[in-house]
Regions:
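Conserved catalytic alpha/beta core of Sir2/sirtuin-type deacylases, generalized to analogous enzyme cores
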Residues: 1-120
Length: 120
């Protein structure tokens, strides 16, 4: 499958193809806005540590597992009322340590969410 050139977003200044902001190389943007969002996320985690929390992972792979996957596993193991749900077509893996408070669904995330919304 080939994507037509006109569908590829381009930089408005130089015309270069844009890329996703992934922590994969030196192009990752970690600016003031990123740090503000990280601070809000840390605050959310701090305020909800002793409450019922669902760590819901949608299609997260192993490109940068230290950002989402591993912290979710660690918090699920450490927090008494945390539950981990992983929906991933190919990698719905659950560590042995948290299997009793987790669910892994090996299906397309869109299909699962549509089923949840329609009560199927």
């Amino acid at each position: 499958m080939r994507i037509p050139d006109y569908l590829i977003p381009r930089c408005p200044h130089c015309g270069a193809p844009l890329s996703m902001n992934l922590r994969a190389d030196s192009t990752f943007v970690e600016d003031k806005g990123w740090h503000a969002a990280a601070s809000r996320y840390d605050d959310f985690l701090r305020r909800h540590k002793n409450l019922k929390v669902l760590f819901w992972e949608l299609g997260t792979g192993y490109n940068t597992p230290g950002i989402i996957k591993y912290p979710f596993w660690q918090m699920t193991a450490a927090w008494p009322d945390a539950f981990y749900a992983c929906i991933n077509l190919e990698q719905a893996e659950i560590p042995l340590e948290i299997q009793n408070k987790s669910i892994g669904i090996s299906k397309d995330a869109r299909e699962v969410i549509e089923n949840l919304l329609t009560g199927v």
